Amino acid sequence: MEKLGVEPEEEGGGDDDEEDAEAWAMELADVGAAASSQGVHDQVLPTPNASSRVIVHVDLDCFYAQVEMISNPELKDKPLGVQQKYLVVTCNYEARKLGVKKLMNVRDAKEKCPQLVLVNGEDLTRYREMSYKVTELLEEFSPVVERLGFDENFVDLTEMVEKRLQQLQSDELSAVTVSGHVYNNQSINLLDVLHIRLLVGSQIAAEMREAMYNQLGLTGCAGVASNKLLAKLVSGVFKPNQQTVLLPESCQHLIHSLNHIKEIPGIGYKTAKCLEALGINSVRDLQTFSPKILEKELGISVAQRIQKLSFGEDNSPVILSGPPQSFSEEDSFKKCSSEVEAKNKIEELLASLLNRVCQDGRKPHTVRLIIRRYSSEKHYGRESRQCPIPSHVIQKLGTGNYDVMTPMVDILMKLFRNMVNVKMPFHLTLLSVCFCNLKALNTAKKGLIDYYLMPSLSTTSRSGKHSFKMKDTHMEDFPKDKETNRDFLPSGRIESTRTRESPLDTTNFSKEKDINEFPLCSLPEGVDQEVFKQLPVDIQEEILSGKSREKFQGKGSVSCPLHASRGVLSFFSKKQMQDIPINPRDHLSSSKQVSSVSPCEPGTSGFNSSSSSYMSSQKDYSYYLDNRLKDERISQGPKEPQGFHFTNSNPAVSAFHSFPNLQSEQLFSRNHTTDSHKQTVATDSHEGLTENREPDSVDEKITFPSDIDPQVFYELPEAVQKELLAEWKRAGSDFHIGHK
C-alpha cells in the first residue's frame, strides 16, 4: 500500500469449514485413476468449491512512482522518490538499488542517495484516477474484482478458467504450460485437476498484466492461488513485474516461510499482541496452540479464523467493489494543537472532497470527522464522530456551488469540538474527513414536486442497515465488542466511534414500514389513494395518525388533528385547506422537537438549537416562530403537538426529514416573508388561513392555470414555487406573469 500512514486492509477469513485437505487429495487421486483411460479432458471441471477456486492478486510496482514516471518520462531512469510531508512514501527500483526504502525520512534518503529526485505526492488525485483505470481494465477479464487500496486488486478467475477449459480439446490440455514462476519450483502434474486450473489462471494473469502495460504503461506482480490469502502471499515472491503460481502441495512451505504471525494477512496489530502474550510468535506456534485456550482468550470466531489462516485456509470471497462507498481525505502531521489550525486543515480536506463529489455524481448524506491524538505507542488509536448532512446542504453538493463550504465547515467543527476539548491543550497527528452514505438520486433531473409523487426509493437505499467500507483503512480483526466503543450522544444524531485503527464504517437507520401495512380505507376524505401510495412513509403515517385522532376525538373536540399536515394535504385538495384552522403553537412545539438537542458530555461543546446552524435551513425557523407568537393574535389550541411527529423513529433520520433539499420546517411551516425586511401578519379571518405572500416583485402579477389554487401555491417553499413556474412555462400552460 502506498498511502501515507495507512496499512493494507485485512482480507479476513470466512468461518465456514473447508473440506479436509487429505480427503480432497484422495478424492482427486481416485478421479485421476478412474479417468486415466478416458483422457484428460473428461476429468476436468469438478464442481467448484474452495479448493478449486482460481484467485489472482495483482500488486502494482511502486505505484505512485510509476504514475509520476508516466507523467514525466524523463524521470524513468533516475532514482525517484514520492514525498509526503517528511517521508518518502515510495520510490522506484532505481532508488531502491541505491539504498532508499519506503517510508524513509527525507533527510535519511538524501544522505543515502544524494541524486534522489523527489516529487510531491500529497495530492492523490492522479493516483486515484489511475487506480480506477486499472480496476476497470481488470473487470474486462472478470467482473468479480475487489479493490484493496490504490495499488492492489483481487480477481476471481474461477468462471473464466471454467470456460477456457471447456473450449480446450483433450490434446490441448496435455500441452498447457505455466506463465511465470511456480513457487518452490514444484513439478506440475497435468493429470491433477487443480494444477491445470491454476496453470490456466496463470495464463490469464499474464494477459491481464500485458494489457495493463500496453494500455496504461503500468507494471505489476501477480500471484495465482486457490484463495485470497495465498494469492496475496505468493504475489510478492518474485518482484518486480513478475508473477508466481502456487500449487496446493506447496501451501505449507509458503506459510512456514513467514517469519512472524503478524506477516499473515488478516492478523492485525492488536491480535498479534494478544497472541504474543500467549507465547505465540511463529506460524507453527499458532497451528499447534490449543484451540480451546485460543477461543477463551480471543473469542470463538476470531480464534477459529486465525487458526485457519495459519494453515493457509481462507474461504472469504472476492467481493465486487463497485463504486467507492465513501470518499475520504486525510492529512497527517507532527502536531496540530489549535482550533484555528484544525479548521484550516479541515477546509483543505473538504475542498478536495467537494471536487470528488462533483466528479462522481452521487450525493453523500453523512459526514464523518476522524482524529488521531499523539501517543507514544507505535499504533495510534483513532476517534471519529459522524452526523447526517442537512438536506438543504445536500442540495448544493456536487453542483460546484462553493457556498456549501461554510455550512459544511461549521458541521465538521462541531464534530471536532465533540471530540476535542478546545479549552484544554491537545496534540493531534491526523485529521480525516469522510463523505459516506453516497446515494445516486434519480431526482437530480426531476422536479421537487415530482419527487413527492414518484415511486419511493427502495428500502435498502433509504433505511435499514448500511455498511460503508473505507478501502484505505486498516480494520482490526479483534472482536468488535472489545475493540470498538460506539456511544450515541443524547440527541442520537452524532455517532461516536473509537477504535485502535479506524472508525467502524457502519450507519444504522430505522427500518421503514412497508406501504402495504397502511389500510387505504382509513384515508381522510379527499385524499387520492394512488398519490398517497407514492408519498414517503413518514408522511403516510402522519396523515393516518391525523385521521385516527379525528375519529376518536369526535366533532366536539377543540383540537385540529391535521394542523401541521395542511401542507401535505394541500397536494390533494383545494377545499380542505380552507376548512382547517391553524394554530401556530402546534407547529412551534414540533419545531422545537426537531431543534432541541441534549448537551454533550462534560468537557466537550454542547449541541443545542442555537449553535446547530446546520440543523435547520438558512433561516432559524424555530426562532422566527417564537417571535411571531409574540406579535400575532393566536387562537387557543391544544398544547400537545398534533401534526409532525418523530416518535419511535431514529433521530438520525427524523431530525432531517426524508424530503430531499427541504427541511421539515420549510415544508410544514407558513412561509414567513418575501422581503428580508418585511413580515406579513396572519389574521383570524378566512384570508388569514394562508399568508398573503406576494410575487417577488410588486410589479408582477401571476395568472395561474385553472386547476391551481393560489393560496396553496404560496404555501409552498420558494424553491418549489420557482420550479413549478418554470415547468408551467416549459409546458406552455395557460398562465402568464404580467407586469404592471
Swiss-Prot record:
<dbReference type="GO" id="GO:0006260">
    <property type="term" value="P:DNA replication"/>
</dbReference>
<feature type="binding site">
    <location>
        <position position="64"/>
    </location>
    <ligand>
        <name>a 2'-deoxyribonucleoside 5'-triphosphate</name>
    </ligand>
</feature>
<dbReference type="GO" id="GO:0046872">
    <property type="term" value="F:metal ion binding"/>
</dbReference>
<feature type="compositionally biased region" description="Basic and acidic residues">
    <location>
        <begin position="672"/>
        <end position="702"/>
    </location>
</feature>
<comment type="similarity">
    <text>Belongs to the DNA polymerase type-Y family.</text>
</comment>
<keyword id="KW-0479">Metal-binding</keyword>
<dbReference type="GO" id="GO:0019985">
    <property type="term" value="P:translesion synthesis"/>
</dbReference>
<dbReference type="GO" id="GO:0003684">
    <property type="term" value="F:damaged DNA binding"/>
</dbReference>
<feature type="region of interest" description="DNA-binding">
    <location>
        <begin position="325"/>
        <end position="439"/>
    </location>
</feature>
<keyword id="KW-0515">Mutator protein</keyword>
<feature type="region of interest" description="Disordered">
    <location>
        <begin position="581"/>
        <end position="615"/>
    </location>
</feature>
<feature type="region of interest" description="Disordered">
    <location>
        <begin position="671"/>
        <end position="704"/>
    </location>
</feature>
<keyword id="KW-0234">DNA repair</keyword>
<keyword id="KW-0548">Nucleotidyltransferase</keyword>
<feature type="binding site">
    <location>
        <position position="59"/>
    </location>
    <ligand>
        <name>Mg(2+)</name>
    </ligand>
</feature>
<dbReference type="InterPro" id="IPR001126">
    <property type="entry name" value="UmuC"/>
</dbReference>
<keyword id="KW-0464">Manganese</keyword>
<dbReference type="GO" id="GO:0016607">
    <property type="term" value="C:nuclear speck"/>
</dbReference>
<feature type="active site" description="Proton acceptor">
    <location>
        <position position="152"/>
    </location>
</feature>
<feature type="domain" description="UmuC">
    <location>
        <begin position="55"/>
        <end position="268"/>
    </location>
</feature>
<keyword id="KW-0460">Magnesium</keyword>
<feature type="compositionally biased region" description="Low complexity">
    <location>
        <begin position="605"/>
        <end position="615"/>
    </location>
</feature>
<feature type="binding site">
    <location>
        <position position="60"/>
    </location>
    <ligand>
        <name>Mg(2+)</name>
    </ligand>
</feature>
<keyword id="KW-0227">DNA damage</keyword>
<comment type="subunit">
    <text>Interacts with POLH. Interacts with REV1. Interacts with ubiquitin.</text>
</comment>
<dbReference type="GO" id="GO:0005654">
    <property type="term" value="C:nucleoplasm"/>
</dbReference>
<keyword id="KW-0235">DNA replication</keyword>
<dbReference type="InterPro" id="IPR025527">
    <property type="entry name" value="HUWE1/Rev1_UBM"/>
</dbReference>
<feature type="short sequence motif" description="Ubiquitin-binding 1 (UBM1)">
    <location>
        <begin position="527"/>
        <end position="544"/>
    </location>
</feature>
<keyword id="KW-0808">Transferase</keyword>
<keyword id="KW-0539">Nucleus</keyword>
<dbReference type="Pfam" id="PF11799">
    <property type="entry name" value="IMS_C"/>
</dbReference>
<keyword id="KW-0238">DNA-binding</keyword>
<dbReference type="InterPro" id="IPR036775">
    <property type="entry name" value="DNA_pol_Y-fam_lit_finger_sf"/>
</dbReference>
<feature type="short sequence motif" description="Ubiquitin-binding 2 (UBM2)">
    <location>
        <begin position="708"/>
        <end position="725"/>
    </location>
</feature>
<dbReference type="Pfam" id="PF00817">
    <property type="entry name" value="IMS"/>
</dbReference>
<dbReference type="GO" id="GO:0042276">
    <property type="term" value="P:error-prone translesion synthesis"/>
</dbReference>
<feature type="binding site">
    <location>
        <position position="151"/>
    </location>
    <ligand>
        <name>Mg(2+)</name>
    </ligand>
</feature>
<dbReference type="GO" id="GO:0006281">
    <property type="term" value="P:DNA repair"/>
</dbReference>
<dbReference type="InterPro" id="IPR017961">
    <property type="entry name" value="DNA_pol_Y-fam_little_finger"/>
</dbReference>
<dbReference type="Pfam" id="PF14377">
    <property type="entry name" value="UBM"/>
</dbReference>
<feature type="binding site">
    <location>
        <position position="60"/>
    </location>
    <ligand>
        <name>Mn(2+)</name>
    </ligand>
</feature>
